[in-house]
Amino acid sequence: AAPALLDAIAKEAVRRGLREFNPQDLSNTAWAYATAGHAAPALLDTIAEEAVRRGLRDFNEQNLANTAWAYGTAGHAAPALLDAIAEEAVQRGLRDFAPQALSNTAWAYATAGRAPPALLD
């Protein structure tokens, strides 16, 4: 029953679009599907597109880290999103990230096989 429910939620979210979701909603949704190990590629594509479209300045550091972690955990390629997260994190300064957020973010990029220049400079 749970996989069917997760499929139905993902389908409905994609159908509606995610413009009403705030940054935490986007982050938590990606995190939930990754944590559940439930593949929802259309939903993850839609979350990535919406986050990149609106920009990440309203995401807090935990939202950024959780989103990166979710895509790494899900094994879902979203290069534009991961590049945008890296740019936003560096622009803010990584000193504002909690240690757990830093480690989750580093893990996500390593798992995704991405080494964005913004994080390496």
Positions of PLM-derived features:
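Eukaryotic RNA-binding helical-repeat scaffolds
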Residues: A1-D121
